[in-house]
Structure formats: structure tokens, C-alpha cells
Amino acid sequence: MFTLKKSLLLLFFLGTINLSLCEEERNAEEERRDEPDERDVQVEKRLLPIVGNLLKSLLGK
């Protein structure tokens, strides 16, 4: 009975570690997918004031 409990505990422990590693890998993949969108937002934030100032100077306002 004691050997069975040790085996089950070991399986549970290894399964928990495996699940944790899978979640970390999935989170890393999601972060990699999110990066281009964040870059686009950063480019828009930098580009919009420049375009706005250019239009103001061209229109003379």
C-alpha cells in the first residue's frame, strides 16, 4: 500500500511539472503572437502626431 501511494504521488508530481511547463510554453507563444500588434500600436502612436503636425502646417492652422 505504501509503495502504491509513493508511485501515485510521484505520478502526480511529474504530471504537475509537465502541466506547468506546457502552460509556460503556451504563454510564451501567445506573447510572441502579441508582439506585432503591440508594435503596430506603438508605430501608430508615433506616427499620428507627426502626420497631424504636418497637416496643420500644410493647412496653415
Curated annotation (Swiss-Prot):
Expressed by the skin glands. Residues 1-22 form the signal peptide. GO terms for cellular component: extracellular region; membrane; other organism cell membrane. GO terms for biological process: defense response to fungus; defense response to Gram-positive bacterium; innate immune response; killing of cells of another organism; regulation of defense response to virus. Has potential application in preventing device infection by S.epidermidis biofilm, since it has the ability, in combination with EDTA, to eradicate S.epidermidis biofilms on silicone catheters. It comes from the Eukaryota. One of its GO terms (molecular function) is lipid binding. Changing G52A: In amidated TB_KKG6A; increase or loss (controversial depending on reference) of activity against Gram-positive bacteria, no change in activity against Gram-negative bacteria (except an increase of activity against A.baumanii and E.coli), and decrease in activity against fungi. It is found in: Secreted; Target cell membrane; Target cell, Target cell cytoplasm. InterPro entries: Frog_antimicrobial_propeptide. Keywords: Amidation, Amphibian defense peptide, Antibiotic, Antimicrobial, Antiviral protein, Cleavage on pair of basic residues, Fungicide, Immunity, Innate immunity, Lipid-binding, Membrane, Pharmaceutical, Secreted, Signal, Target cell cytoplasm, Target cell membrane, Target membrane. Residues 23-44 form a propeptide. The modification Leucine amide is found at L59. Belongs to the frog skin active peptide (FSAP) family. Temporin subfamily. Amphipathic alpha-helical antimicrobial peptide with potent activity against Gram-positive bacteria, weak activity against Gram-negative bacteria, and moderate activity against fungi. Mainly acts by causing membrane permeabilization, but is unable to forme pore-like openings. Is also able to penetrate eukaryotic cells (keratinocytes), and kill intracellular S.aureus (both wild-type and MRSA) without injuring host cells. Shows inhibitory effect on biofilm formation of Gram-positive bacteria, but not of Gram-negative bacteria. Homo-oligomerizes in membranes as homodimers, homotrimers, or even homotetramers. Oligomerizes in presence of LPS. In Gram-positive bacterial mimetic membranes, the aggregation is weakly pronounced, and penetration proceeds more rapidly and is deeper than in Gram-negative bacterial mimetic membranes where aggregation is high. Homo-oligomerization is prevented by temporin-L. This is Temporin-1Tb. It comes from Rana temporaria (European common frog).
